[in-house]
Amino acid sequence: MRELRFYNTLTRKKENFIPIDATRVRLYVCGPTVYDYAHIGNARPVIVFDILFRLLRHVYGNEHVIYARNITDVDDKINARAAYEYPELALNDAIRQLTQLTYTQFQQDTMALGCLPPTIEPRATDHLEEMRSLIERLLEKGHAYKAENHVLFSVSSIRNDPHYGSFAKRSLDEMRAGARVDVASYKREEMDFVLWKPSAEGEPGWTSPAGIPVLGRPGWHIECSAMSMAKLLAPYGGGLTCDDPTENVFDIHGGGLDLIFPHHENEIAQSCSAFGTERMANLWMHNGFLQVEGKKMSKSLSNFITIRSILESDFFEFNGVLTNEMKQNWAGLSARFSMLQTHYREPLNWTAQRLMQSSSELYRWYELLRCEKTEMEKKNEVIDDSLINALSDDLNTPKALTLLRKFYKRGNAVSLASGMNFFGLLRQEWVRDGKCPLFMRKTSLDEKFIDQRIAERLRLIHNKEWTAADTIRDKLAAEGIVLKDIKDPQTGERTTMWEIKRF
């Protein structure tokens, strides 16, 4: 079995990845809160963990990897946005309208970014029973308490490892100083956090745990503990009915650096306290932060960019015959390519220039594949082992893309295509369709005239009249026509393909 090494946030070092059970490798990633269009910061973990998902499937087999990415559809941000967007509706109706709209948009965005769908996408509102049961387990074990119709996690109740703050590598004093925590009067200690809260009249609410007489809703942190339990533990012998702590650990938990504290710290506290485990997951992976043009992305700085705005932007020319879907898919793959050029743990600086450069380079790759499609059809597309080696070393996508560039420079279309396909950058129909509108920009030159000039150039080359041949090539280039000389696969004779220059 291939050796995989990843940086583990839990231990702050690279480690060999050894799955608990190689026939069911389990990955959980924190997904979106569906109250607004996803922004490009949200796109980064979606793309990063899609690459990890693809690698795990390659190594262990498609049917042996379970990837769960949750959807948070109950949250105070959702309530506030729903009331603002749909003031004419009752709040619960407004919430349903908002969450369905933003969830559907998120699905469309991730598809345009070239991502595979996760194995499972649990929604918080479908797992309220598991949340209540988990909260009641924490109450029974003395790790939670009730106060004014709330249930709170007691941080001081943790006596064994992992102690609270060990994941974030912070002491309680450091966390108190750096955290913006609610110091409500019903808390025993300021770092205690909400597992369940009462709902005001008109707010969404469900039957509360532990006999609390009013309707309520879960806190954010308990949602992920419950959903990961429901999808990655309970189906495989773990969960609340299992007394063996070793059965209540899964393989990989992922998310952004911003989630380390408090969200992931609190998830670990809840899950480990409920199940008596030393770890919630064996490997924790976090992608780095994203900036826009060297600055923190913020609505106040007017540099807040949604995935949707990228997909709908006109950062490069298209001719008028493209469908909206094709435009958006090209923009999505360009954005994906741009992000993969930075290692997932490094900060990523998103710039318009870099997006255009990525789009231009990706276009050239497609041009090679289109020119060599006959040759590609003769050979099986087997992923080059050097690409898998690069990804096996902590998802080193920059190194892997450097290898793809070498394939391009050598004209190795077969290896380039298989690599692009593995990275989610290849749409086969764009290569196979000789008249794909993406590669058919308008020109003022008549096609018959172009073909005549190409024939004349080939004659000059045959006669070794290089200067005259180059003159024809240069004049066509000035009109936006790019020539590519190839050998006819049947006769071995030189022939020339032409495309309208894309950039």
From Swiss-Prot:
Localization terms from the record: Cytoplasm
GO molecular function terms listed in the Swiss-Prot or TrEMBL record: ATP binding; cysteine-tRNA ligase activity; zinc ion binding
EC number: 6.1.1.16
Residue numbers binding Zn(2+): C30, C224, H263, E267
Transport among keywords: no
Binding residues for ATP: K299
Major site of localization recorded for this protein: cytoplasm
Top-rank taxon: Bacteria
Cofactor stoichiometry and binding remark: Binds 1 zinc ion per subunit.
Needed co-factor(s): Zn(2+)
Primary enzyme class: ligase
UniProt-listed GO biological process terms: cysteinyl-tRNA aminoacylation
Renumbered ranges of motif 'KMSKS' region: 296-300
Keywords, alphabetical: Aminoacyl-tRNA synthetase, ATP-binding, Cytoplasm, Ligase, Metal-binding, Nucleotide-binding, Protein biosynthesis, Zinc
Catalytic reactions on record: tRNA(Cys) + L-cysteine + ATP = L-cysteinyl-tRNA(Cys) + AMP + diphosphate
Assigned GO CC terms: cytosol
Motif ('HIGH' region): 32-42
Assigned protein family: Belongs to the class-I aminoacyl-tRNA synthetase family.
Subunit comment: Monomer.
HAMAP family: Cys_tRNA_synth
Protein name: Cysteine--tRNA ligase
